[in-house]
Amino acid sequence: MPQLSFHSPVGDLTVSEADGQIVSLDWGWGRDQEETKLLRRARDQLHAYFDGQRLAFDLPIAPVGTPYRCRVWAALRVIPPGETRTYQDIARTAGGSARSVGGANGANPIPILIPCHRVVASRGLGGYSGGDGLPTKRYLLDLESRTLAATGRPGGP
């Protein structure tokens, strides 16, 4: 499976492709580097995101999971940048419980592109399995808020 690794402010990231679609984004450096046009495009869009120049991604993705997890991940993709929803909010949309939404979030194969960092507990941030955990989640949420404020788009202060 072609994959491309690169440095980011939240650590090294590896994006993988199968059949012309992004199938995973993992923390760490991948062993089997094979650049493709799509992987370069993904890397460039992620760099622009981290540079505060982009909030949305225009990439074909194909997360692999159970039908329930796929419903949860679809619900995450409609949360606007700079905003959050609670696990319970997502459960109302996708079905199941807040706890099952947390399980689907933890199994998200394409974090950042599928913005599981925008889901929070009703009494705080909740958890985050990517990078350094909660500091990474805080960083991503703060980055989106700063980008919105700098671009003057709705949702900025």
Give, region by region, the residue ranges found by the protein language model:
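Basic nucleic-acid-binding alpha-helical/helix-turn surface characteristic of O6-alkylguanine DNA
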Residues: 1-96, 143-157
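…primarily DNA-binding HTH/wHTH and HhH modules…
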Residues: 123-157
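Short Lys/Arg-enriched helix C-cap and helix-to-coil transition segments
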Residues: 112-121
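Short glycine-/small-residue-rich flexible loop motifs, especially phosphate/cofactor-binding loops
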Residues: 88, 102, 138
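Structural signal for hydrophobic
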Residues: 76, 116-117, 140
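Residue-level detection of the helix-turn-helix DNA-binding "recognition helix"
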Residues: 106
